[in-house]
Structure formats: C-alpha cells, structure tokens
Amino acid sequence: MADQAKLGGKPSDDSNFAMIRDGVASYLNDSDPEETNEWMDSLDGLLQESSPERARYLMLRLLERASAKRVSLPPMTSTDYVNTIPTSMEPEFPGDEEMEKRYRRWIRWNAAIMVHRAQRPGIGVGGHISTYAGAAPLYEVGFNHFFRGKDHPGGGDQIFFQGHASPGMYARAFMEGRLSEDDLDGFRQEVSREQGGIPSYPHPHGMKDFWEFPTVSMGLGPMDAIYQARFNRYLENRGIKDTSDQHVWAFLGDGEMDEPESRGLIQQAALNNLDNLTFVVNCNLQRLDGPVRGNTKIIQELESFFRGAGWSVIKVVWGREWDELLEKDQDGALVEIMNNTSDGDYQTFKANDGAYVREHFFGRDPRTAKLVENMTDEEIWKLPRGGHDYRKVYAAYKRALETKDRPTVILAHTIKGYGLGHNFEGRNATHQMKKLTLDDLKLFRDKQGIPITDEQLEKDPYLPPYYHPGEDAPEIKYMKERRAALGGYLPERRENYDPIQVPPLDKLRSVRKGSGKQQIATTMATVRTFKELMRDKGLADRLVPIIPDEARTFGLDSWFPTLKIYNPHGQNYVPVDHDLMLSYREAPEGQILHEGINEAGSVASFIAAGTSYATHGKAMIPLYIFYSMFGFQRTGDSIWAAADQMARGFLLGATAGRTTLTGEGLQHMDGHSPVLASTNEGVETYDPSFAYEIAHLVHRGIDRMYGPGKGEDVIYYITIYNEPTPQPAEPEGLDVEGLHKGIYLYSRGEGTGHEANILASGVGMQWALKAASILEADYGVRANIYSATSWVNLARDGAARNKAQLRNPGADAGEAFVTTQLKQTSGPYVAVSDFSTDLPNQIREWVPGDYTVLGADGFGFSDTRPAARRFFNIDAESIVVAVLNSLAREGKIDVSVAAQAAEKFKLDDPTSVSVDPNAPEE
C-alpha cells in the first residue's frame, strides 16, 4: 500500500496501481494526491470518450509544452536509483530462506578456501576469491528455484557462468557430492597431478562433462549467449527441436560490459524478440584496478543502454532493510541522494563503517539524517545492497521469466568480496588478493557461521579445512531435492546426440569430375559441394549456412529461393528483386543465417550451431563463409572459444590470398590467415587447389565429426579463392591419405633433364603448373608438382614426432609424413602459395633437401593480380628463377642461367606485367 500511496493512487482504482518502474520516474513523492487523481480521472475520461491515439497525441503535446516551459523531465531510458519492482509487487518466496542461506554460506566458504589453498607453498597458481563471494545470492536463487537441468521435461536451460565466479560452481558441486576435496585441491593444476585437476574458468575443453560455455576472455559470454538464445529459436522454427521451454541465462560483470562484444550485439536480442534470454549483471561497481565508473553510475548507464536497445530492464539496487526508509521518504530526499551519489562514493562507503555512511550519505540532507536518527551505526552499516537480498533477486528472476517478446537484463547491485571481511569488501585491490590472513580466516568463518575451531585454522593457515556437514544433513538433502525438482545438477555437459547419416563420397562425383573447359573458382566449387550435400535427405536439414552479407560475392544467392534466409518475423515486405529467380527470401523456417555485416555475430552463430550436438543433442553442421581477412584476424578470440567449447563445423575463408582479391587493398587482402589458424589446435587448416580436393576434405570432415564411431571435435578451416581456374578431374590413383594429411605428388616432370620439385597450394598451383611448363620447354628441367593441401597439418605431424623423440630418445618416432612424401622424388624443393612465407616455412625442418620458399610477405595493395604477384615474386616466372637458382646451388647448372632468367623476366619490375588476362569484366 505504501507504494500506491507514494504514486498518489487509490488502491481500488485500476488506473492508479503500483507499477514496475519501466522507463518513467515513478518513485516520486506526491504532494497533492487529490490533484493527481483529478488528472488521472481526466485521462480516464479521455480514453472513454475518444481513443488511445488521441490520448497519446495529447500526452506528447503536454511533454512538448513541459519541455518548452523548462520543466525538468526524467530521461525515458532511465529511472530513479531504486528497485524496479516495488515492494508491494514482490511475489512470495517459495523456498526455505534460512535453510538456503546456511548452505549458501558454506558454499561461499569453500569457494574462498579453495582459492586460498591454491596459494600454498609450491603451488601459488592464483584465482579469484572475491567475485563469487559478492555474487553468491545471484547464483543460489537460480540454482534453487530457476535453473533447469538436462533432465527437465522442457530440455533444460543454458547457463553462461561469469568466469571469475567459477570457484563458487566448484564449491557447490563439492556440496552436491560431484567433486571431492581432492578435486578442489586440484584447482588450476590440470596436468601437474596424476589424478588431474580442474581449470581456472569455465573451460569445456578442460572439464568435458562439467562446463558447457567458455565465458573468458571477457565479453564473449554476452555475445555468445545472445546467439545461443537465437539459435534455440532457429531450431524450434525449423522443426528440429522444441526449445520453447528452455531459457538462456548469462552472468556478467559490470566491468566486463565495457567490452565491445558485451554491448555491441544486444540489439540483435531485441530484434529477434528473445524473451528466452536473461542477462544478470553483477554490478559490484569494480573492475580489476578500480571503479567501473567512479564519477557516474554504471547501473544507470547500463539501464539506458539496454532500454534503448529494446530490452526489459530490472534493477535490484537495495535490500529489504531499505524498504521502510524509502516508505518514510515522503518528500523524495533519500531517492534524490541515491540518484546523485556516484559509484566511487558508494564503493568508499563500504570500505569504511556505519558512522561514515551516516555522515557522508545520510548526512547530505537534514531530512535523510532524520530518517536514520534512531538507527545505530551498526544498523546503518548492515543496510544491504539489492544483489545480496534473496527475495529481491527472486522477484527479479521471476519477472524476467514472465516478460514476453523481449529479452531482460537484471542489474544487481552487489559488493565485491562480500562476507570476506573488512580487508576485502569493496577494496580496489581485492582482484589481486588471493589468500586470507589467519585473522581474515577467523573473521570470515564467524561471519559465515562455519563450525570450524580456531585450532583447526591455526594448525596450518595455508590449509584451512573445507566444510561439509555430511550427506544426511537436512541442508544437503534440501539442496539435492531442489536440483532434482529442476531437472538435475548444473553445470553439466552431455554428448548424447541423434546420429546423422553421412552420405557416401560418391554423392560428390559431379564436383570430383572437374569442370572441363570451363574455369571456375574454388569458392564456386565449394558452393557446389555443399549444394550437392543439400540434396541428401539425411543431411540437408543439419547444414547451417552462415553468411555475413556477402552471399552474392560468394555465389550463394542461388540458395535464397530454396533454403530461404532465417527471420523469425518472416518477410513482411515485397523485396525489390521479387520478380527475379534469385530473389531475396526470408522466412521463419529459413535455413540460412544471414548475419549482415557482422563477423562477431557470425562466429557466435557458428559456435551455437557447432556445439548443438552437446547443447541440444542435435548434430548440426555450420558452414560459415567469410572474407578470409576478417576471420582469424578479426574474430580469432571467438574461434579460440569455439575450439574450447569443442565446436564442429566448417570455416570457409573466401576471397583468400594476398594477390587474388583484385584491387581491394591492404585491409582486405589476406596473406596470413592460415598462419593465424595454425595457432588454434582445434582447427585443421587446408589450402586446396582443386575442386576434387575440396570434395574430399568436406566429406572427410563431416565423417570425422559425425560418422559412425567417430565424433571428433574438429573445425575445418578451408581457404577458397575467387579467381576462376581450370578444374581437372580427380586423377586416377589419387593419394587420398596424402591429400588429407597435407601433401601428395600431383604430377611428375617429363624428360631426362635435371629434376626439381615445386610444392604449391591454393591458387599458387596454377603458377606452379605454368612454371613447370616453362622449365621443361626453355631449360630442360623436369619439375615435379606436389599439392600441399595443408602446410599446417604437415608441421604439426613433424612437431609431434620431434616431441615424441625428445621424451623417449631411444625410441623411433618415425619419419615425418612430409619427409616420406617428398622422398618420392629428388632435387631441390621450391614452395609457393598466395600467403606469407611463414606458412610453407613451417615444414622447413622436415624437407629432405635444398628448400626455397616464395610468398606474399608484407601488406597487400590495390592493383592487378599479375602486378601484385610479380611484386611479391610468387608468379610463374619467379618460380622458374627460384628453381634455377636452387639447381645452381646444388652445382647442377651455372648460376648465370638463373641470373639471365631473372633479367629476362624482369622480376623486379611489376609494371612489366600489369595486364590481367583473367580479370573479371565489370
């Protein structure tokens, strides 16, 4: 009733009820309720006599007049610094709050002690002790009442846990009996113990049955959660799985929200009406070094930002002990102080005491000082933040699940290090504090009510005991009952997925037979490969094309009419090309994820689709095609997270190569993406030259991912080009295993002259073939051609053998695969690709002879292909000179032959080859 009176309302009048503070400043004192009611009655009368449109018009005119008269109006994107949900609208709390509080404190203790014990002498592996301490209620309300496990009839929720709060999840699993004390003592010691350890953060790669979603580095969690929620809807709209009763929760830090990935895609959640998504931002006002916003207020900033992007915003600022004070705040003085106090001051308050708060907060106004005149300093000190109030948090979560047609963000005000004691709570240095002193331990124990004696703590301050009351304790039974009712323990990851039928390789025979006299780019060959797979009924609906607004560039527009572009709202307009065969078609059941100019979101979709086999038990195969320059260079961190999450699928780096994308210039022309990709162990990198190679790679990739008895966690990165080239038919007796492992002998040179070898990949194969012809015709040299489909695979194989030999010097680790392959021929070796020399140089150690590497080192630039290739000396003529030079070093020909060839071909003059006979016509 207090809230209703504060709003000037009559409880029986449905036009004047307590309301959710959603975009208006509703927590204001009403100095004349009678006049307020007259205005309300006038509005009611207008609505009865006229229409909502008329009422809207008049309200807007009133706002216009108020602005003209310089009436200070609140911004519609933010509300007062108070709880969004009025006390009178809070639901009944359904659990046993005291019971839950007891084991919440035990979990908080064990989480901190786990990190503390990890700093024992000889270990000292770090950890975050304060984040979970302050966020514990945010998680425990969820675990006890909202988060649904894998066995829930609706399928279970997906929870993105804040990375730095991982100790709390381990501590809870210990209370549940899923982890042992020994497991906790293995925190951050994954390989140094025989029995293994547990990773620092949520890393599925490190705990395959536990963690589902990697949320570090910071910023990835928010973005991936949005696209996970969207992919859930995608599966539902396409009829693959009913996800209507599944919810995505993302727990984030307020400092983390400064990452571009944290905020940069929130509009997508609103555009897609993702009411299956809730962000919970732990607003402890601190980042790693200091306040998130010292002079202003991060909660208010985030409220405006999210509300402006179309989200529902719920603020949980103050705990229940503030309710009475706010009720007495008849003239709004307390709310005014709350509004005007900066985050820096709020942090300082919690680093002092109640007397300080009385003087420097309530003492700012005589009216607020009077509000607390009968409270002790201790009572003032104990006034809690909203994120520590179980009932306030429960009300926010319940409201979030009831919100329809838009996502929700909950902004929960907390104290970093809450409960750890005065030396930790709200301190700037708390991020770097990894252990507690003996006095800190005793104070922490007392505040949490842990039944551990001084003697136990003093025995070895480095190893204070964990606490567990035993499996038969009522608290443990209650905790387990709550999880059983909600569908099982969390976090949990499973890999029980429906099998898919991998079509036979013969399905791709049309791609493998070549293009005849027609020249086609390997990009088009890739599109044709997947188009053939789309015709297979057992596989077609499991393919997920992902495109960042370049479908027409890649020749994928032919998929628009048949597969359609996914849009949950359908297509409520007539497309400008509606009368064309390849018209732009959107539909709720569309298969293509067209992400716009948005590589970050595209990779997030790739992750959601590529991990669906574990998240949803549905094997999906994403094929994300993009400008290769904007893949690993732009979104490498996300692809790293994809590997951590054990995603499966295809990354297709189109318009690849430093010289192949004509004219685009320095920022577009990719000469190093395979080098970057080589650093990611979850990715196998290929640079195929021919269509039949692509067909083999794609088929083998799908089979490795989902073939019978396979299930490899592998991502294929395949570079493909936009330059049309001849596509030969698959040779008889093709060395298929060589193709997959990274190199095979494509052709042998003819004649009786000196022998040499050219190793080529990608579009570089065409220059190698031309060079071989010149060498044979003009210099009598027999040039063998090797197709190097994967320099990276070859280097990894060699490195693995080196490591095996290092660890067991007496054992035979075997010969590197590339060495064995190259021994089929003799003579020097010259490698060429449209990438930097770093790529072919990865195998130098295992090449059994003189080895020269040509590559496109340095920045790209705008020009023709021939000019660029002459500039970088990777064209056919440069290869010829490199081969001749190698033969001269071996004493087989005179060096003057190479010198004359270099002068003849003008290798230092790009102007001599400025015309491109294969340039596309505009």
From Swiss-Prot:
<keyword id="KW-0786">Thiamine pyrophosphate</keyword>
<dbReference type="GO" id="GO:0004739">
    <property type="term" value="F:pyruvate dehydrogenase (acetyl-transferring) activity"/>
</dbReference>
<dbReference type="InterPro" id="IPR029061">
    <property type="entry name" value="THDP-binding"/>
</dbReference>
<comment type="subunit">
    <text>Homodimer. Part of an unusual ODH/PDH supercomplex, consisting of AceE (E1), AceF (E2), and Lpd (E3) together with OdhA (E1+E2).</text>
</comment>
<dbReference type="Pfam" id="PF17831">
    <property type="entry name" value="PDH_E1_M"/>
</dbReference>
<dbReference type="Pfam" id="PF22613">
    <property type="entry name" value="Transketolase_C_1"/>
</dbReference>
<dbReference type="Pfam" id="PF00456">
    <property type="entry name" value="Transketolase_N"/>
</dbReference>
<dbReference type="InterPro" id="IPR055152">
    <property type="entry name" value="Transketolase-like_C_2"/>
</dbReference>
<comment type="function">
    <text>Is a specific component of the pyruvate dehydrogenase (PDH) complex, that catalyzes the overall conversion of pyruvate to acetyl-CoA and CO(2). AceE has reductase activity with pyruvate but does not react with 2-oxoglutarate.</text>
</comment>
<dbReference type="GO" id="GO:0000287">
    <property type="term" value="F:magnesium ion binding"/>
</dbReference>
<dbReference type="InterPro" id="IPR051157">
    <property type="entry name" value="PDH/Transketolase"/>
</dbReference>
<dbReference type="InterPro" id="IPR009014">
    <property type="entry name" value="Transketo_C/PFOR_II"/>
</dbReference>
<protein>
    <recommendedName>
        <fullName>Pyruvate dehydrogenase E1 component</fullName>
        <ecNumber>1.2.4.1</ecNumber>
    </recommendedName>
</protein>
<dbReference type="InterPro" id="IPR035807">
    <property type="entry name" value="PDC_E1_N"/>
</dbReference>
<dbReference type="InterPro" id="IPR005474">
    <property type="entry name" value="Transketolase_N"/>
</dbReference>
<dbReference type="InterPro" id="IPR041621">
    <property type="entry name" value="PDH_E1_M"/>
</dbReference>
<dbReference type="InterPro" id="IPR004660">
    <property type="entry name" value="PDH_E1"/>
</dbReference>
<keyword id="KW-0460">Magnesium</keyword>
<keyword id="KW-0670">Pyruvate</keyword>
<keyword id="KW-0560">Oxidoreductase</keyword>
